[in-house]
Swiss-Prot record:
It comes from Penicillium oxalicum (strain 114-2 / CGMCC 5302) (Penicillium decumbens). Disruption phenotype: Does not affect the production of oxopyrrolidines A and B. It comes from the Eukaryota. The keyword Membrane applies. This is opdI. The keyword Transmembrane applies. Part of the gene cluster that mediates the biosynthesis of oxopyrrolidines, polyketide-amino acid hybrid compounds with feature structures of tetramic acid. Does not seem to play a role in oxopyrrolidines A and B biosynthesis. Residues 66-81, 91-101 have a biased composition (Polar residues). It is found in: Membrane. GO terms for cellular component: membrane. Residues 56-101 are annotated as: Disordered. It is a single-pass membrane protein. The chain crosses the membrane at residues 30-49. The gene is opdI. Keywords: Membrane, Transmembrane, Transmembrane helix.
Length: 101
């Protein structure tokens, strides 16, 4: 134990380690205790992981409303260009062709 004492003296360098009980994890002298720290960290990890998993899922839905699936024919193919307001300018009754192409 003599080597432990000398290394402890050089490690703490200036303050008495007997008064450093707040930094130890034993439950006797005001510390939280090792088991309590592990439980707390485990709970925090669980809740953070649960929140991250839920946010990566689909957006939250109203559980009282029935789930409606989108019919297959209502979905657009992914390779078509945007139709709608962009091409409506060429159908203007003035006769001008304002087509961007």
């Amino acid at each position: 134990m003599r080597g432990y004492r000398s290394s402890q003296r050089t490690f703490f360098r200036g303050f008495d380690p007997r008064h450093a009980y707040r930094f130890r994890g034993d439950g006797r002298h005001g510390g939280m205790g090792g088991a309590l720290k592990i439980v707390f960290l485990g709970m925090m990890t669980y809740f953070i992981a649960k929140k991250a998993f839920r946010s990566s899922q689909h957006p939250p839905t109203d559980f009282n409303a029935p789930v409606q699936s989108v019919p297959q024919r209502a979905q657009r193919p992914s390779d078509t260009r945007l139709q709608g307001p962009v091409l409506l300018a060429s159908n203007h009754p003035s006769g001008d062709s304002a087509s961007p192409e």
